[in-house]
């Protein structure tokens, strides 16, 4: 199986889709920038917790790669003025789950906290993502849930957390870490990669696996308020 990551390796500040007021997810998504040995990379992240002083965001591990790395998160472009920037650090990574957690300092209230879907998505559900493909942020695209593995099958009824979600949502460099969400604006996954043989499809980390990693991190930080 050949997968291609959706990180973008050139810093670009291109404004994407106009902000639709009706979609609250836009206010919970950030374009992120990290410095690595090969240069600066950019991707997408989304807020999932706010403890009153700090914002916690999820993104893809293949962007972050290591705990302690600095990150800059920027808000959506306003109609007038400049985007706000917030500094933070990588506080959790999981290579096998391609999941990374960021902590933004003094950023409480800067981003809307997105909700996780209480139920697993079903094949045929309409889903959306917001990201920074080729640096164009924010860009919203949509598609449908194809399945929960590379065969396009439904999820089984086991208690094991589902790991991946296949959708027909287009994804390109810069989309990595973007939320995949349903028509109720609930997160059902996170963009991770595109299938090399099927570029019209994207591979996401399933919401159940995201929650597993969130639980692992916050159990280690039990003194923090988790919303």
Regions found by a protein language model. Give the residues of each.
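C-terminal motif of bacterial Sec signal peptides marking the signal peptidase cleavage site
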Residues: 3-5
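Catalytic-histidine neighborhood of serine endopeptidases
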Residues: 8-9, 48-96, 193
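C-terminal cap/linker of serine protease catalytic domains
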Residues: 9-20, 70-72, 187-227
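Active-site substrate-binding loop(s) of clan PA
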Residues: 13, 17-21, 46-48, 89-91, ...
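A conserved glycine-rich beta-strand in the N-terminal activation segment of trypsin-fold
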Residues: 17-18, 29-57, 85-86, 177, ...
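Catalytic nucleophile loop of clan PA
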Residues: 46, 170-191
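Gly/Ser-enriched beta-turn/beta-hairpin loop segments
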Residues: 79, 91-98, 148-165
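Flexible, gly/ser-rich surface segments that form the specificity/activation loops bordering the active-site cleft
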Residues: 112-162, 171-175, 191-202
């Amino acid at each position: 199986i050949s997968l291609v990551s959706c990180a973008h390796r050139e810093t670009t500040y291109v404004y994407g889709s106009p902000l639709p007021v009706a979609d609250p997810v836009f206010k919970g998504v950030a374009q992120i920038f990290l410095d690595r040995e090969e240069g600066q990379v950019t991707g997408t992240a989304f807020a999932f917790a706010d403890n009153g002083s700090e914002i916690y965001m999820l993104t893809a591990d293949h962007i972050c790669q290591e705990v302690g790395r600095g990150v800059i998160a920027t808000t959506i472009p306003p109609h007038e003025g400049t985007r706000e920037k917030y500094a933070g650090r990588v506080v959790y990574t999981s290579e096998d789950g391609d999941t990374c957690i960021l902590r933004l300092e003094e950023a409480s209230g800067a981003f809307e906290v997105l909700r996780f879907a209480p139920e697993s998505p079903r094949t045929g559900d309409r889903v959306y993502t917001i990201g920074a493909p080729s640096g164009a942020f924010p860009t919203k695209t949509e598609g449908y849930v194809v399945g929960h593995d590379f065969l396009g099958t439904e999820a089984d009824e086991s208690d094991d957390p589902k790991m991946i979600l296949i959708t027909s949502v287009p994804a390109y460099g810069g989309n990595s870490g973007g939320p995949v969400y349903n028509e109720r604006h609930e997160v059902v996954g996170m963009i991770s990669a595109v299938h090399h043989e099927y570029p019209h499809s994207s591979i996401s980390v399933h919401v159940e696996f995201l929650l597993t990693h969130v639980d692992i991190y916050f159990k280690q930080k039990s003194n923090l308020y988790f919303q």
